[in-house]
A protein has these predicted regions:
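PLP-dependent enzyme catalytic core of the Aspartate aminotransferase-like
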Residues: 30, 143-146, 153-162, 167-200
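Conserved glycine-rich beta-strand-loop-beta hairpin in the small C-terminal domain of fold type I
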Residues: 82, 86, 102-112, 124-138, ...
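Short amphipathic alpha-helical/adjacent loop interface patches that line ligand
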Residues: 6, 101, 108, 189
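Catalytic PLP-binding core of fold-type I/II PLP enzymes
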Residues: 1-19
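Conserved core segment of the aminotransferase class I/II
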Residues: 27-105, 112-113, 117
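Residue-level recognition of strand-loop junctions within catalytic nucleotide-signaling folds
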Residues: 57-58, 90, 136-138, 179-181
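Proline-centered loop/turn at the N-terminus of a beta-strand
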Residues: 1-3, 33-35, 161
Length: 200
């Protein structure tokens, strides 16, 4: 029997116009075989607090998970993390998330359009959620006779701290975080344009 462990941590961060579809809502079978994992940590910047939780409808599966997790106190919530979790999911938290989603959409739209217009040979998909963007730089690297390590170092050298996409099984990918003020997104893309992708 197959059990699905579904990481739903980004479910709060769908961009405006898109909707998160929980794995457990797809079918009765999915509901019974899925362990869905959630946390407010990415959405509300609470990663330092232990506030993850799971939703498991299948009683037998839930009992197994709860027994295994009770053997260690490593992931046990404390008073502060419980109050942070409750506070995050109050109406004020949702209002904040709605505003955050608008900022992330603005950043994602700007980045997507800028890349298509200015970074010839870089491919990407328009994101539907979260704040990460994956740049497929294979064509660009081949056209410029360079490798991904050199490209990554060039960005870091001009203050663009991006992440190697290879650990995510994408050999020429760069992972770019767009969770920052829009003015800094514009500055980062200006630097990438002048000093990395279109350097003279």
């Amino acid at each position: 029997e197959c059990v699905v462990i579904s990481d739903e941590i980004g479910s709060d961060l769908t961009l405006p116009g898109f909707k998160h579809i929980p794995t457990q809502s797809v079918s009765k079978d999915a509901r019974e075989r899925t362990i869905a994992l959630y946390a407010p940590s990415k959405t509300f910047n609470l990663a330092g607090l232990v506030g993850s939780y799971h939703i498991i409808y299948n009683r037998m599966l839930r009992d197994r998970v709860e027994k295994a997790s009770s053997l260690s106190h490593y992931n046990s919530p404390n008073v502060l993390s419980v109050h942070a979790l409750i506070g995050a999911y109050r109406p004020e938290g949702y209002q904040w998330v709605d505003e955050l989603r608008e900022v992330l959409k603005s950043n994602a739209d700007y980045a997507y359009n800028y890349i298509l217009e200015h970074f010839k040979g870089v491919k990407l998909s328009k994101p539907e959620g979260t704040y990460m963007l994956y740049l497929d730089c294979e064509e660009w690297c081949k056209e410029h006779d360079t490798d991904i390590d050199t490209l990554l170092k060039a960005g870091v050298a001009v203050g663009v701290i991006w992440q190697d996409g290879r650990p995510f099984h994408r050999p020429y990918a760069i992972r770019l975080n767009l969770a920052l003020p829009h003015v800094l997104v514009k500055e980062a893309f200006d630097r990438m344009d002048k000093y990395v992708f279109n350097a003279k």
